[in-house]
Curated annotation (Swiss-Prot):
The keyword Lipid biosynthesis does not apply. Signal peptide: none annotated. It comes from Crocosphaera subtropica (strain ATCC 51142 / BH68) (Cyanothece sp. (strain ATCC 51142)). This is Cytochrome c biogenesis protein CcsB. The gene is ccsB. It is found in: Cellular thylakoid membrane. Required during biogenesis of c-type cytochromes (cytochrome c6 and cytochrome f) at the step of heme attachment.
Length: 451
């Protein structure tokens, strides 16, 4: 007989089962769940601190190798570990799945059995059983019906078997932890679903322009159905409100959702913290810029030139353009603007400041009449779709409800009638003082029955 032909003993057959039980025990361990939760929180914080979805040059500039931030955090480390898109990395999603598995295992191996035990009728049949209760007494009464009615008046659900009564209330407190676990699983599922199916895009759009979502910064592997293809956005107008001292108070974008035929489907003026939502896609007002300037040289048609954001080495934002003053482009002037309030600076061919102008003013320079009509603003939009958000909100609501439910005390009272003696005792899992007062009140209500 070969080894493979040897009969399997019961001990050998039970080894896989024992290993599975040991694995379940490890996965359901509260300590593992706490470690996973702390890891998720830590990496979530890193995703908040470290800018997400930026270009490689951005990380090279802000996280150089020398000196490294905290001695180790460089742009290479960020890119290798995926810290530039934490929430969609395989290891972060794996942490969420593992934490969800731990919660599920704990729910079925601990919470459901605890609820089942709490729902079970557990009668005391011997007087000595009351000795293990911290709160118990003996009364000389023989009217169990009166005791039963009194407990029901106090909100207890009572069960009677022969000369024994079992009463309980607050079973919802045992359901609370299960609701909490279910809520956390819904939140985790929503986060994973959002990472797989959501996308993040950006757009800088001049006033009067139309666009479709195409500048995708981040996208999940299942996000294509979320990206709008049969509708787009038209920027009707963009403007900025300034305070009396010249600082920005708020900037606004008047947007229209349009279909492929140009028909308006929805209209809304958005500003910071007041986005436009349409078919699961949200448009946030996040930035602004100067897209161009309209000008006229002598009697030429009004033309529009683009304005570019200049490098000021961190000394504020300035946009500039070059306006030709001769048909052969041999001469021209530079026009600079720092905001949409209207004041622009004109520099001649040598780079010297020539004049300051405002929209509608006419300037004589290089032998021509230059008229500036207006600056064209552009709105900076962040576009986001996250189908997991409804699940996260639902889970958060259930989580709050489950936490409140968990604070309800699960109280139990046992009564046993033996001859002329009535034994009564009880216990609770929280609010011990309140329960003691309630039980003493019940006992005091029963004491007059001694006579």
């Amino acid at each position: 007989m070969t080894i493979s032909d040897s009969p399997q003993t019961p001990e050998n057959l039970s080894l896989p089962k024992q290993g599975f039980r040991q694995l379940i025990k490890i996965v359901a361990d509260l300590r593992l769940a706490i470690v996973l939760l702390l890891a998720i929180a830590l990496f979530s914080i890193s995703g908040t601190v470290i800018e997400q979805g930026e270009t490689i040059s951005f990380y090279q500039q802000n996280y150089p190798e020398d000196p490294a931030l905290f001695g180790f955090l460089t742009w290479k480390v960020i890119l290798i570990l995926g810290l530039n898109h934490v929430y969609t990395t395989w290891w972060f999603l794996s942490l969420l799945v593992l934490f969800g598995t731990s919660l599920t295992t704990c729910t079925f191996t601990r919470q459901f059995p605890a609820l089942k035990a709490a729902r079970k009728w557990n009668f005391y049949q011997k007087a000595r059983q009351f000795e293990k209760l911290a709160l118990s007494t003996e009364l000389a009464i023989n009217d169990l019906k009166f005791v039963n009615n009194l407990l029901e008046q106090k909100g207890y659900k009572t069960f009677q078997e022969n000369q024994a009564i079992y009463a309980r209330k607050g079973i919802i407190g045992k359901i609370g932890p299960i609701v909490v676990h279910a809520a956390m699983l819904i939140i985790l599922g929503g986060a994973i679903w959002g990472a797989l199916t959501g996308f993040l895009a950006q757009a800088m759009v001049p006033t009067g322009s139309e666009f479709k979502v195409n500048n995708i910064i981040e996208a999940g592997p299942l996000s294509q159905p979320q990206i709008p293809k049969d509708w787009g956005i038209r920027v009707n107008r963009f403007w900025i409100d300034y305070t009396p001292d010249g600082t920005i108070d708020q900037f606004y974008s008047d947007l229209s959702v349009i279909n492929n035929d140009g028909e308006e489907l929805k209209h809304k003026t958005i500003y910071v913290n007041e986005p436009l939502r349409y078919h699961g896609v949200t448009f946030y007002q996040t930035d602004w810029g100067i897209a161009g300037v309209q000008a006229q040289v002598n009697n030429s048609p009004i033309f529009q030139l683009p304005m570019a954001l200049l490098n000021t080495n961190g000394n504020g934002r300035i946009w500039g353009t070059w306006i030709p003053t001769k048909p052969d482009l041999s001469e021209g002037v530079s026009l600079l603007a720092k905001d949409l309030q209207g004041t622009m600076m004109v520099y001649d061919q040598k780079g010297d400041l020539y004049s300051a102008v405002r929209p509608g003013m006419i300037l004589d320079i290089n032998g021509v009449r230059l008229k500036i009509y207006q600056l064209i603003g552009s709105t900076g939009l962040q576009i986001k779709a996250d189908p997991g958000i409804p699940f996260v909100y639902t889970g958060f609501g259930l989580l709050m409800m489950g936490v409140i439910m968990s604070y309800v005390s699960h109280s139990q009272i046992w009564v046993l009638q033996e001859d002329e003696h009535c034994y009564i005792g009880g216990k609770t899992n929280r609010s011990q003082v309140t329960f003691e007062r309630e039980l003493l009140g019940i006992i005091e209500s029963l004491e007059p029955e001694k006579t």
